[in-house]
């Protein structure tokens, strides 16, 4: 979990789980995600709501089971992933966090397809997932023991469904088709794209929304760019002269685009800082020592988020007993508070590692967001809009 302010220890009541979905993030060109990413979504009803289709609208209750390589170093090596160096951990994440991660940051769509499981299979799967999250460490191989294979193992062991027994190594973007072919997944929910979006069976990449906003901009202003990517590739200063020419609707579109531009700059900065960190660490030139020490403390302290058994000094098996949970809540809260402090320190230290040109670009986009916001409020006021 990337939010170190969130309560680290949670509970899931299997009785409140309405359905389990196969959640697929579409592929992109990065080596570690060019086959998509397989996850399972627990569709959980809010307290007091009877199990039924309406639970699908309780998006804030849904949890995602996501097998990922637990990387205890800043560098994600594709080679290490191919040879199984990374521990495989079952992360339990809020659905909203996963939607933002894929649709807004990585610009990848998500499909959430119901699995045809009976009540006993659903409840057993939830219990098995809890045990796997609690203490599982496997080896993560991008090719042969990846998220699809791990998800399939969890489905197989959790449901004991014989239709899963003879499935072997497979890629994420092929597993859904196989599950559908064996009558275990209902892909018909994706047939009507608009209805799929409305009912939470699909979460679209923000790329199409950004392009739609850019089309609004192009209708009013004679900009030369035709694709939103080209517009966002401009320097912030090159976009700025257009702002004061925009009407109310176009200004609203510009604000969303500039916020997307800021997200893009932060992603670029993240990659640049990572490369600088790795190069400086290799050269031992001392320029990243402070950030390095903080980051290592964070990595050492964050393992419990994906494997809570680390917090108990015991070699037992199964889920913790009631008295152990009291100890867990205390220790996990202390560890979480430490991570929050370290995260704040790291943010300051990493910003100092930015190249001056990148730092200027981020500052310029932040200024653009502020400028458009003020322009939008002025237009709104001039049009007689309600002032809050």
Report the location of each language-model feature.
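Low-complexity, highly charged intrinsically disordered N-terminal segments
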Residues: 1-14
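Activation targets extended, charge/polar-rich intrinsically disordered C-terminal tails
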Residues: 1-2, 113, 128-388
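Glycine-rich catalytic cores of cysteine/serine-nucleophile enzymes that process amide/ester linkages
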Residues: 16-107, 351-358, 362
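Secondary-structure boundary elements
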Residues: 45-49, 120, 156-164
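N-terminal accessory/precursor segments of enzymes
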Residues: 75-148
